[in-house]
Amino acid sequence: MTRSAPPNERGEWPHVVPLAARRTHALRHRRIKITRVLVASVLVAFATAAGATATVAPLAAAAAPHDAACGVLQGHGITWPSASWATCVTGSIAESSPTVADWGDTTIVAVGDENGMLHVINAATGRELPGWPQRLAAPAGTRVAIESSPTIAFLDGPNKPPSIIVGAGSTWVHNTAREVEAFRLSGAIRFVFHVGSAPGTAVGVISTPAVGNLTGGSQQDIVFGSWDHYLYALTPAGRLLPGFPVNNADTIWSSPALYRVPGTVGDSIFIGADASSWHNCRGGLISDYRYVRGALKLVWQHCESQTIWSSPAVGVINSSGRAAVVVGTGYFWQPFPWATYRLFAYYADDGARVPGWPVVTSGPSFGSPAIGMINKTGVPAVVDTSWVCDGLTETSCLTTYASRVTAWNGNGRRLWSDELSQPTDFSSPVLAPLHTGTWNDVLVGSGAGLYAINGRTGTFMFGSSPTDSTIDPTCRMFNAVAVADVLGEGPGAGWSVIEACGGPAQFSYPGKIVSYPLPVVPIVQPAWPMFHQDPAHDGTAA
């Protein structure tokens, strides 16, 4: 749809004028809700009894594998290190991934829950920082939930405390708030930006904000997509940048990646979107927007036959030395078209397809790909999750009771592929060394819990397996873990894996945030240590 006028600097729309040629998206919203109920009903059959909640449960290195206070449970035969601490919250945690950043001598963790609470925690102790948690500032009588991952960014420069930015939106609960909110580290509100609404579809922002430099100056800009059909870019004060918002005429689920193409002034915005006739496309769009001579320009765009709900990753993946944009697809258009079973890669500079791509997947790839070295070749690979489907409809992806994680080299050759327990995986992989070598291994979740996988061989590590056991099977994952060298004093100090999990509210489990010691002190930095690579969530390989 289109609008009669752009919003003001507070993000308020004067009024809405729908186009007769544009269909509404009531069917899309209804189908999403039905799908999630079906997924939950399949997974509930495998659920164990719910554990009690607690504020913080620090665990000694030799503690028993189960902590009754917060439900930390190791699967059968698991040799993964015992948890350093575990914190349970009253709201469930679904697709919001933990984000980790350092400020001073403290490492902080930020994650959102389905009650609209944003948690900011000391990663060494597991305790909320002073002034936290904070509920998003939804108007009275509205329901607010968070599935966007919080972004931690130094909007006032590297010598001032960071800010935390997150969107309100949910596919699991009926969210009625439509905003992106920025907080100061103290918990004080920095700004609230209200997005619009589109007739017949859900409201809100599930897209994770990315922070970068769009215009080439020193300012840090905030970029995100919205279900109101628009792509936004804001200043640190929450005001729109020139040329924004950009009308996509359909919903945006994807989180943007920001990357400065060599020879350009500022970062390009690479983002996926839905398409149902916009630019003569029925399926999904992957686009590159950038400022050219001071004006915002659509530099290149590809139309694929399926929605693009995946969040793109950017990085060099072959000997060309050119950065590639790698992205998966969704599952709206049914019977599934060809693109549903593909992972795409385009060169960032001009949008040309990378030789050997797209590659074949076992179903939709909802998560964000990870890029990094996972073997001794010295060349980065691509790792992503996908559903396992045996037909051309979303229900055919439920009855397989499985998902898959796969690694490809930059030429599109499959290196290895592993099946994971539980269907319709929404988790994104993280790449970090779990051994003493110079390459990265894979940490990835599913509805069954967290898996550790050898990056070079694809074999399961620490006793995890798709048929028997995961790291804490009560910690259902619909997001990504974070890996960091945690500063400060406390049981979680040092190299750690931080997991936020439990699953949607349909499971009746509290949200759980757990810190585990990394099995080894890595001799190389993790290549892709959290969702969309870094605290600013620019989605670009280091």
Task: Report the location of each language-model feature.
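Generic alpha-helical structural signal
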Residues: 2-5, 26, 40, 478
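Secretory targeting and sorting signals
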Residues: 16, 22-23, 29-62
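Extracytoplasmic/lumenal domain signature
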Residues: 59, 63-542
